[in-house]
Amino acid sequence: MSTILKWAGNKTAIMSELKKHLPAGPRLVEPFAGSCAVMMATDYPSYLVADINPDLINLYKKVAADCESFISRARVLFKEANREVAYYNIRQEFNYSTEITDFMKAVYFLYLNRHGYRGLCRYNKSGHFNI
């Protein structure tokens, strides 16, 4: 199963082996969510997904809240902004706009992840996304 994000350290390729070591129970706790590869490849009744990256958590919250709207907006952005200059404009708005909604920040985060270098997620000392 693939995930919506490209992510360094993604566990998709090792899931068949990793699943052998996961405990049985009603809930899987995933403290380092990343691409959520473990969650996507298992069928626990519930999950606790956590990560230190607030942009990543915001993305998952917005997708969970309104998946169809998220997909629709991302689809338009991916089609219309598939150029280098658009990437840098979106990154600029993602980093500096004070008027961007959490919903659009999540859409932009997905765009930056999918269009950036190998799905890397890196922030500079000022806390700005810089891939």
Functional labels for PLM-detected ranges:
Residues 42:
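Aromatic pocket-lining residues of Rossmann-like dinucleotide-binding sites
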Residues 1-32, 37-38:
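S-adenosyl-L-methionine
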Residues 45-131:
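Class I S-adenosyl-L-methionine-dependent methyltransferase module
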